[in-house]
Design a protein with these regions (language model features):
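Short hydrophobic alpha-helical runs that function as membrane-insertion/retention elements
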Residues: 41-43, 63-66, 90
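Short, acidic/turn-prone active-site loops that include or flank metal/cofactor-
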Residues: 44-50, 68-71, 94-96
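Short, surface-exposed amphipathic charged segments that create phosphate/polyanion-binding patches used
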Residues: 57-61, 99-114
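Acidic beta-strand-to-loop metal/phosphate-binding motif
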Residues: 26-28, 62-75
Length: 130
């Protein structure tokens, strides 16, 4: 538990971005979210909770770009599957052993722009290919 007395399953770093921007970037950690600027949020790890997913679903943001670390591909796909019926979703796979902070904002955004939005069937195919 953190200083609020809550576990990480109730935390979303930069939560307000969900209500301020049409597009948000979901990262694992706060440093990665900060690298992407005001639209970056963090789930405080690769695992995510039902509470965190519901907060994202209930928010007015329309586009969700998932940028978890390379060792979390399965978690990224699982999160996308939770969100794809409610939001437009991109899953951006980062180069091995690199996270958003390692790449920097400019290189990360190039990857984002070169990644297409995914439908449910695309995510299922991707999940089955891992």
């Amino acid at each position: 538990k953190d200083i609020t007395g809550l576990g990480k399953e109730f935390l979303i770093f930069n939560y307000d971005a969900l209500f301020m921007y049409r597009s948000i970037f979901i990262c694992e950690g706060a440093i990665n979210a900060l690298t992407l600027g005001e639209r970056g949020i963090a789930l405080m790890g690769k695992a995510f909770s039902r509470y965190q997913v519901n907060q994202i679903i209930k928010s007015p943001c329309e586009h969700v770009i998932i940028l978890l670390d390379p060792d979390a591909k399965e978690y990224a796909i699982k999160l996308a599957l939770e969100l794809v019926h409610f939001k437009k979703v991109k899953v951006v796979f980062l180069p091995e052993e690199k996270d958003v902070n390692d790449l920097g904002k400019s290189e990360t955004l190039k990857l984002v722009y070169n990644t297409r939005y995914m439908q449910y069937k695309d995510l299922i195919e991707l999940k089955n290919s891992l």
